[in-house]
């Protein structure tokens, strides 16, 4: 078992001390990335398997880079190209992974709870890279790391999360993570995309984007999934941009020097204007860079911290 437990399934039940350990461990990992030779032998002899049942560029590449910078061997299983497409179940895939002798498995799956199911089946450390609309813990951890790096703290900050909360696993993990670390989380978006029960998670649901943005220290903009328009969950892209899009004028409501983030990929001109995405307050590119450092920390703590049997 690693220094933060066997697996990373979500942030819902993760204590603040464990989150802090991950963020603190990511600091020296970022120093490694800044070196001319971005490689250390920390996880030499370890095998990390990535299994993605949904398309991903950023997350998969980030985990693969993290593993390679730590000298781990990586195996990528693209679900469409594997026996999954022939009807193989998740448990069958788990047995195959176990036979490979993997030390860690990074899983993305459209079904909520898939990572937890896999964790019960294999001895390897399982990292949830997104399971349905449930959680995406490594994204939230890199968001926390980025904000702490920019602001010097997390406790007492006002964090506004804007957009499609209902279908966003990032939003759920961010809510758990930021509230656990003492931040105030505000939510805003179309009423049809704000599910019930958000207050029970410790967040405040605002009646407008403007209310959520008022004096906010951090603004997290969520990608609007275009297929939701076809389902009638919001009126149209132009209308969404007018009512909920984060532009320069709306951003003035936030605190001076507010940090703007987006988990990607972005719909420029819809949920976020190009001026904001590319502006001085944007930390979107830093999120990508920090994502590798945080995932290096996770792989180290779960498989290379000297506590695995």
Swiss-Prot record:
L-aspartate binds at residues 86, 169, 223. The keyword Transferase applies. The keyword Transferase applies. GO terms for cellular component: cytosol. Carbamoyl phosphate binds at residues 58-59, 108, 136, 139, 264-265. PROSITE patterns: CARBAMOYLTRANSFERASE. SUPFAM superfamilies: Aspartate/ornithine carbamoyltransferase. This is Aspartate carbamoyltransferase catalytic subunit. It comes from Pelotomaculum thermopropionicum (strain DSM 13744 / JCM 10971 / SI). The lineage of its organism: Bacteria, Bacillati, Bacillota, Clostridia, Eubacteriales. The gene is pyrB.
